[in-house]
From Swiss-Prot:
Originating organism: Escherichia coli (strain K12)
Function: Represses expression of BhsA/ComC by binding to its promoter region in the absence of copper.
Residue ranges of coiled coil: none
PROSITE patterns: HTH_TETR_2
Name used for this protein in its record: HTH-type transcriptional repressor ComR
Modes of activity regulation: Binding to the promoter region of BhsA/ComC is released in the presence of copper.
DNA-binding region location: 41-60
Single GO MF annotation: DNA-binding transcription factor activity
Length: 210
């Protein structure tokens, strides 16, 4: 029995390490978030994820494919949760926006991730010839703005926003506030500072919807 047990241990030690896709994406996310797409090399990704280059290629095809998978992971882990704050029927429009901004401010200043917004950080570091990656990020930004517009349209239909208010322009304005919060966080702004920005925006709400 002892011999059989020893053989089992030896066999288990010899098994190849299983590739953990989610863990690899989270590690790659931190690199792209901190340094940007173009400044992050495949060698950096191999070192951070602990996976061999052929494994990453087999799973994601190339660096661009890995980035797209990371972007999807970011949206699932962070952006979608922020946007969920908007669509709680029990909240007033101001309360929903306050919770949305608070979730974003906490994310942008979290000690667990690099400062700022993953998407905005990457956009600001791309070169003019970045091509498909730039288009992918631009498309996602447009989705964020459309989500805000959808939220505002719903609240307008409920009578919380006057019918004459242009919710398209209002969504653009709110999206610009978020971009400014990201840049401020990247420059070292604290959670309290970002909450002040959000608070000022909400205090202006009656004027914004006139």
């Amino acid at each position: 029995m002892a011999t059989d047990s020893t053989q089992c241990v030896k066999k288990s030690r010899g098994r190849p390490k299983v590739f953990d896709r989610d863990a690899a994406l989270d590690k790659a996310m931190k690199l792209f978030w901190q340094h940007g797409y173009e400044a992050t090399s495949l060698a950096d990704l191999v070192e951070a994820t602990g996976a061999k280059a052929p494994t990453l290629y087999a799973e994601f095809t190339n660096k661009e494919g890995l980035f797209r998978a990371v972007l999807d992971r970011y949206i699932d882990r962070f952006a979608a949760k922020h946007e969920a704050q908007l669509f709680c029927e029990e909240k007033s429009v101001e309360s929903a926006l306050a919770d949305y901004f608070a979730a974003i401010a906490n994310c942008f200043t979290s000690k667990d991730t690099p400062a700022g917004c993953f998407m905005i950080n990457n956009c600001t570091t791309l070169s003019p010839d970045s091509g498909d990656i730039a288009n992918t990020l631009k498309s996602r930004h447009a989705m964020q703005e459309r989500t805000l517009q959808q939220f505002l349209c719903q609240r307008q239909a409920r009578g919380e926003i006057p019918p004459h208010c242009d919710v398209t322009h209002l969504a653009e304005f709110l999206n610009c506030i978020i971009q400014g919060m990201s840049i401020s966080a990247r420059e070292g702004a604290s959670l309290e500072k970002l909450m002040q920005i959000a608070g000022t925006t909400l205090r202006l709400w009656p004027e914004l919807v006139k």
